[in-house]
Amino acid sequence: MYKCSKCRDMLFILNKDEAIACECRDIRIAETILQKSGISEKFREKTFESFKYEIDSEILRAYTKAVNYSKDFVKAFDNSKNKRAINKISSIILVGQVGSGKTHLSMAIANTLLSKGISVIYMPFRDIITQIKQNILDEEYYKKYVSRYQRAKVLLIDDLFKGNISKSDINIIFEIVNYRYLNNLPMIISSEYDINSLLQIDEAIGSRLIEMSEENIVQIKGKKLNYRIYKGK
């Protein structure tokens, strides 16, 4: 049983000596990009449309910045002569306390890019770092796993430096960040740590993230701010 009866899932239709792209091709490519992203069904629901930005002025400011970044990213991608070349697009960092909505916004950016056919790989910091460390003695596995995040067209790092930070944690994330820094590959980053704290944890990583993000550093402040509590009201 084929998903597409027209091309029999070949994505192309043969017309004499010519192969014509089937109308299902773009849909299949988009599905593949989404599957490879590592973003769960739950997180796919985190969009700009479902974000409650009316809660607080800080939330609204962060929302506006994230929306504008997404629009600029898509525009730059659409205007690029080579659709695979997105290395001139800067990164974005969203930092703030627990429950400030930074994960929702970073996911909304990622989901917007995915909907436009732009590949994004999701990296939940603590989970992935733990998996990598558990297999650190397997050189082939280590290189392959780290390479996935180094070479992703767009990388979303969620909750950077969450949990107790060890020297090996810093070394692993430096490998990823430094590769992307040297190759101008954009990142979407969320963290509970503010910019100064990121620099204190590791200046080499923090300084690279700041340089890569340029004007796209969003700090969500406010002691009473908790997006998770108020979004349902």
Per-range role (PLM):
Residues M1-R61, K65-N68, N216-I217, G222, ...:
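A short, basic N-terminal segment
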Residues E54-T64, V95, L114-R151:
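Short glycine-rich substrate-engagement loop in P-loop NTPases that contacts/grips substrate
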Residues K65-A85:
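Pre-Walker A adenine-sensing motif
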Residues N82-S106:
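Walker A/P-loop nucleotide-binding motif
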Residues H104-I118:
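P-loop NTPase Walker A phosphate-binding motif
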Residues I118-S119, R151-V154, N183-I189:
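Loop/turn-to-beta-strand initiation segments
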Residues R126, Y145-S168:
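Conserved P-loop NTPase "ATPase switch" module shared by AAA+ and STAND
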